[in-house]
C-alpha cells in the first residue's frame, strides 16, 4: 500500500532497492545482516510492519516479532553499517483522550498491542540509530487496487448495500499515501533528524463523516450512511477516540505541509474510480 506509492514517488530521484516480505523477512536477523552487507545502503526506509490492529491484539507474539524484534534487527544493522533510518509509525501511539490533535511534543501512551509495538519500535530506533527520522501517519488511504483500508472498504461496500452504519465517536486525520511519501522525501532531504507527524491537514473527522464524504465524492446515491456508537461494534483492540495530529515539526523545519485531506481524498477517489 504505502510501499508502492513510496517507490513511485522516490524512484526518479533515488536508487531504490525495495524488498517484499518474501524477499526479506525482518524477523530473521541473519537475513537482514546479509542484505545490508550485500547492498551497503546509505539510507533505510523501514515500512515492514504488522498493521492489522485486531490481529496484533489476538496474536501479540507475532506483533512483537515483526514490529519490535524486526525493527530492532533493522536498527542494529543500520548502526553497524552507518546507515540512516526512516521509521514509519502511527498517531495511535497516543491514548486518544485529548480534546485536540496531538503534536510531536505530546507524550505517547499507547493502549493497543499494535500501538505499543509501534511505540516500542520508535524507542528502539531512537536508542540505536543516531541518524534517524520517525514519521507518524494518521488514517492511511491510497495504494490503488491494493488498498484494503477504510476508504476503499467504504467505496466497495457502498456500491453493494443500501445502508452502512459507521461509528461517529472516533476522530482522525486521513493521510494519503502519495502525500505521505512526498513528506518522507522532504524530511529525509532536510537532514533534520527527529520525530515528525505527516498527515493531511484539516479538522479532525469522524469515521462517519469521512464515510459520508467518500460516497459523496464517488456520487453513490443508493447507499445511506448512518451513525452509530463504537460500542455497537466491539473489537479485540481498543481504538483511540482522538487519532489526529498536527504537523508542527514540519512547519518548524520549513518543510512543505501536506494538503487538506478533503482535496487528497477527492484526487484519490476520482483516480481510483477512473481506473476501475
Indicate where each model-derived feature is located.
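Mid/C-terminal beta-alpha module of Rossmann-like enzyme folds, strongest
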Residues: 5, 183, 190-236, 241, ...
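Adenosine-cofactor binding site in Rossmann-like domains, unifying the SAM/SAH pocket
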Residues: 11-34
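SDR active-site strand-loop-helix element
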Residues: 19, 44-48, 85-91, 135-137
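NAD(P)H-binding glycine-rich loop region in Rossmannoid oxidoreductase-like domains
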Residues: 29-66
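NAD(P)-cofactor binding segment of oxidoreductase domains
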Residues: 44, 58-86
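Catalytic helix-loop patch of NAD(P)-dependent Rossmann-fold dehydrogenases
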Residues: 65, 69-73, 80, 93-135, ...
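NAD(P)-dependent short-chain dehydrogenase/reductase
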Residues: 123-172, 178-179, 185
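Amphipathic terminal alpha-helices
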Residues: 260-276
Amino acid at each position: 500500500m504505502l510501499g508502492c506509492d513510496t517507490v513511485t514517488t522516490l524512484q526518479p530521484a533515488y536508487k531504490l532497492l525495495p524488498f517484499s516480505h518474501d524477499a526479506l523477512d525482518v524477523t530473521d536477523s541473519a537475513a537482514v545482516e546479509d542484505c545490508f552487507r550485500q547492498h551497503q545502503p546509505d539510507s533505510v526506509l523501514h515500512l515492514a510492519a504488522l498493521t492489522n490492529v485486531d490481529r496484533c491484539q489476538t496474536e501479540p507474539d507475532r506483533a512483537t516479532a515483526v514490529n519490535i524484534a524486526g525493527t530492532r534487527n533493522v536498527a542494529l544493522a543500520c548502526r553497524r553499517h552507518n546507515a540512516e533510518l526512516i521509521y514509519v509509525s502511527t498517531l495511535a501511539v497516543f491514548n486518544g483522550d485529548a480534546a485536540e490533535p496531538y503534536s510531536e511534543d505530546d507524550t505517547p501512551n499507547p493502549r493497543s498491542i499494535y500501538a505499543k509495538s509501534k511505540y516500542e519500535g520508535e524507542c528502539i530506533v531512537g536508542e540505536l540509530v543516531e541518524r534517524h527520522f520517525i514519521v507518524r501517519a494518521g488514517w492511511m488511504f491510497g495504494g490503488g487496487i491494493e488498498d484494503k483500508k477504510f476508504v476503499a472498504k467504504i467505496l466497495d461496500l457502498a456500491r453493494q448495500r443500501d445502508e452502512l452504519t459507521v461509528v461517529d465517536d472516533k476522530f482522525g486525520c486521513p493521510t494519503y499515501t502519495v502525500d505521505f511519501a512526498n513528506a518522507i522525501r522532504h524530511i529525509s532531504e532536510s537532514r533534520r533528524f527527529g520525530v515528525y507527524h505527516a498527515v493531511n491537514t484539516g479538522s479532525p473527522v469522524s469515521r462517519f463523516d469521512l464515510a459520508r464524504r467518500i460516497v459523496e465524492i464517488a456520487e453513490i446515491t443508493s447507499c445511506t450512511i448512518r451513525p452509530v456508537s463504537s460500542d455497537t461494534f466491539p473489537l479485540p483492540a481498543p481504538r483511540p477516540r482522538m487519532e489526529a495530529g498536527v504537523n508542527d515539526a514540519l512547519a518548524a523545519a520549513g518543510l512543505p505541509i501536506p494538503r487538506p485531506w478533503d482535496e487528497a481524498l477527492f484526487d484519490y477517489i476520482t483516480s481510483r474510480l477512473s481506473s476501475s
